[in-house]
Amino acid sequence: MQRIVIQNFGPIKDATIEIPKFLLLIGEQASGKSTVAKLIYFFRSLKEDFTKRMYKQPTRGYSWKNDFEVPTRQKFIQFFGRPNQQFEITFYYTHSNTVSIKWDNKTLCIEMSDIFKKILRGVPKPQYIVLVSNTNSSDIPRIER
């Protein structure tokens, strides 16, 4: 089951929330219900963003910084603005697959579990680029429809 751990983010000082298929948040006004919902949406959408980025850039290899860290940092700031206090948020997709975001010493740090990094390292540059760059265009057969 997915889980989120939030420390010192907005109105939430310390929370660990299990995330079933259906989650009902009840509480006083300004207690952090919307913040929790927005964080859950944000982290769930990262998984989709990650997959899209892996398939979107076929002309080069992939890098952790350019293909995940920088876009995630930008997206976080779009969603929540620039932080003004130290915080840490960890989202558990599974027991061993996590993404953490923390603000420490005026830096927004993004960390992911090793399994995500292994996936990125395992994505090779597409082989067809080598083929096309070494082939004369007149040698490529035309396909008529």
Model-derived segments and spans:
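P-loop NTPase switch/coupling surface
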Residues: 1-145
